[in-house]
């Protein structure tokens, strides 16, 4: 039988004399999801004794469709607490989940270590699909500066499915100067911007929808009105754990809309009030 380091009642035993207690960081089952174009990922190993250098053997127990290329050993320099195990995935396809199971062995692996010496990793490259043009209406910058919050900005939306959510993304409409409107009135940028307000770069809004609700990941807007870069995101999960005071957004699949209620999002400017975040 083996012990479960995640169990509440689990207390590690004493390591054998001189054993460094090398193990994986994290749970037995781990999920790794990466964006297209990324062909590797890192797993982290840790150890209890760090005075001397150490090496551990890595055995592949399961390599689904032979997607994974793994090193046979991982080494720690003297004094190092953690080390990286880099897994290459050169032939993985988008939108498919592959399983990798690894085991550690050697004189510095112990059944009494603080974590697992075997893990199972479910790996996937996210597959994005275009779902067409949508319209973003902003109530953060608008309320902060008193400009019209009902102005629609046309954005090209992509969608993917992760292990825990449905995810949407689109380029920041604030990182552009509006030069035209489409047939329904959507601007192709932020109509209150001038050229000098735009900060060159790539800025992407990412919204995760789960059973709890919709959450906007922290994002830089790509816009500066003289007080530093604008940024924003969901208050809950980033600035607060009080979901009653700072609710998540509401996803209406039938209507094809996501609505963020009052106090669900924050806005910040890097050089204003030390970059303080203000809920709206």
Q: Where are each of the predicted segments found?
A:
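Acidic/polar, low-complexity intrinsically disordered N-terminal segments immediately downstream
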Residues: 4-142
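Ser/Thr/Gly/Pro-rich, low-complexity flexible regions
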Residues: 126-280
């Amino acid at each position: 039988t083996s012990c479960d380091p995640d169990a509440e009642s689990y207390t590690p035993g004493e390591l054998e004399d001189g054993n460094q207690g090398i193990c994986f960081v994290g749970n037995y089952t781990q999920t790794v999801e990466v964006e297209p174009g990324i062909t590797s990922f890192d797993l982290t190993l840790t150890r209890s004794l760090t005075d001397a250098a150490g090496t551990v053997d890595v055995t592949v127990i399961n390599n689904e469709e032979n997607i994974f290329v793994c090193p046979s050993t991982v080494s720690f320099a003297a004094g190092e607490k953690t080390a990286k195990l880099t897994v290459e995935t050169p032939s993985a396809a988008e939108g498919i989940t592959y399983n990798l199971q690894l085991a550690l062995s050697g004189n510095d692996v112990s059944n009494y270590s603080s974590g697992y010496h075997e893990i199972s990793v479910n790996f996937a490259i996210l597959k994005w699909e275009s779902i067409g043009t949508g319209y973003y209406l902003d109530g953060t910058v608008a309320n902060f500066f008193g400009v019209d919050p009902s102005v629609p900005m046309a954005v090209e939306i992509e969608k993917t499915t992760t292990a825990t959510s449905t995810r949407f993304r689109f380029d920041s409409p604030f990182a552009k100067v509006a030069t035209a409107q489409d047939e329904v009135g959507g601007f192709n940028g932020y109509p209150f911007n001038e050229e000098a307000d735009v900060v060159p770069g790539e800025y992407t809004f990412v919204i995760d929808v789960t059973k709890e609700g919709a959450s906007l990941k922290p994002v830089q807007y790509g816009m500066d009105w003289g007080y530093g870069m604008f940024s924003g995101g969901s208050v809950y999960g980033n600035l607060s754990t009080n979901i009653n005071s700072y609710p998540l957004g509401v996803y209406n699949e039938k209507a094809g809309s996501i609505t963020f209620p009052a106090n669900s999002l924050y806005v910040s400017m890097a050089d204003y009030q030390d970059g303080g975040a203000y809920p709206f």
